[in-house]
Amino acid sequence: MKLPIYLDYSATTPVDPRVAQKMIECLTVEGNFGNPASRSHVFGWKAEEAVENARRQVADLVSADPREIVWTSGATESNNLAIKGVAHFYASKGKHLITSKVEHKAVLDTTRQLEREGFEVTYIEPGEDGLITPSMIEAALRDDTILVSIMHVNNEIGTINDIAAIGELTRSRGVLFHVDGAQSTGKVEIDLASLKVDLMSFSAHKTYGPKGIGALYVSRKPRVRLEAAMHGGGHERGMRSGTLATHQIVGMGEAFRIAKEEMAAESVRIKALSDRFYKQVENLEELYVNGSLTARVPHNLNLSFNYVEGESLIMALKDLAVSSGSACTSASLEPSYVLRALGRNDELAHSSIRFTFGRFSTEEEIDYAAQKVCEAVTRLRALSPLWDMFKDGVDISKIEWAAH
């Protein structure tokens, strides 16, 4: 077993060696290095063939038509293109959008920008389990609502929203539905042939593919129109100009092909690892699981260790790569906005750690990690006067602290 141990698979995943091999073949002079837009010679034709093959592989994982897959630089760009693209194209129909308070910053910062442009956005508060229900969305719908954007799997707490039920509602009301699927590919079955989803964002690097490449599913039936954000050579049917990065695209295609083949077996194995980890830490006092216990992916275990500061616990777990909050926002010392939206108090939100397991996690690593967590939590609590007061039966929430 090699240290440190990587338990932050929701932040990014290592590229699968099979994916890396396919990518290398598209880089050098001996390989498939041409520009897919070069129509006048064989180098371009071969590159275009590789790009279209990858498009089919991505479409196959999510049961879409390959013509509905638009290449982007990642899920952040896909979210921007979907939300701004719809808002700007359909602004004459209405200027109201609906999303939730627990979305990724790539959605929330995009809607904030639209608010500055004069759009109105309703931010739905989730239940204590972190889930967004169709009834919550129904209550927020207005005559001028043009788009609902709700994530499939939450990046911090791993909860799975019922996008099938939400899609039925939005379609019946004639409102477009965008789903951020960055965290769900390879973890949850996605059948866009039957789901009433109009737009869906994907990322390669959360599914053992390379960083810097993603895709946006844009429904053809019913047809969805978008205003482009990148202008240039008219690539991707005018929706996203820019020379296609063949090696990145081929990597994403191969990653999604592997995900389709291995997802069922991999999920069973990862659930066993997650259960194994939880069984070894669940006897710690004042331990809370954040998010629904049932509607969640097995890869994610977000735990709050009351009376332990999350950042100090991460420091104590120097052999484990884990995070507090999402990788995109954990640089700030604010408690997780996702956990706050669930109704967790600041103390519990600050004491949360996200453990995420993946393809290369082993039982040996899990056992070592669980042992280290138990030792660190016990040691840090022994140093905490708040823990002593709690053990003495003092209700800490009733204490009035003196101002300095």
UniProtKB/Swiss-Prot annotation:
Catalytic residues as annotated in Swiss-Prot or TrEMBL: 328
GO molecular-function terms, A-Z: 2 iron, 2 sulfur cluster binding; cysteine desulfurase activity; metal ion binding; pyridoxal phosphate binding
GO biological process entries: [2Fe-2S] cluster assembly
Record-listed pyridoxal 5'-phosphate binding positions: 75-76, 155, 183, 203-205, 243
EC numbers on record: 2.8.1.7
Domain of life: Bacteria
Keyword Iron-sulfur attached: yes
An example Gene Ontology CC term for this record: L-cysteine desulfurase complex
Pathway stated in the Swiss-Prot or TrEMBL entry: Cofactor biosynthesis; iron-sulfur cluster biosynthesis
Modified residues (N6-(pyridoxal phosphate)lysine): 206
Pfam families the UniProt entry points to: Aminotran_5
Cofactor: pyridoxal 5'-phosphate
Cross-referenced Gene3D superfamilies: Aspartate Aminotransferase, domain 1, Type I PLP-dependent aspartate aminotransferase-like (Major domain)
Known catalytic reactions: (sulfur carrier)-H + L-cysteine = (sulfur carrier)-SH + L-alanine
Subcellular location: Cytoplasm
Role, per record: Master enzyme that delivers sulfur to a number of partners involved in Fe-S cluster assembly, tRNA modification or cofactor biosynthesis. Catalyzes the removal of elemental sulfur atoms from cysteine to produce alanine. Functions as a sulfur delivery protein for Fe-S cluster synthesis onto IscU, an Fe-S scaffold assembly protein, as well as other S acceptor proteins.
Subunit structure: Homodimer. Forms a heterotetramer with IscU, interacts with other sulfur acceptors.
Similarity annotation: Belongs to the class-V pyridoxal-phosphate-dependent aminotransferase family. NifS/IscS subfamily.
Protein name in UniProt: Cysteine desulfurase IscS
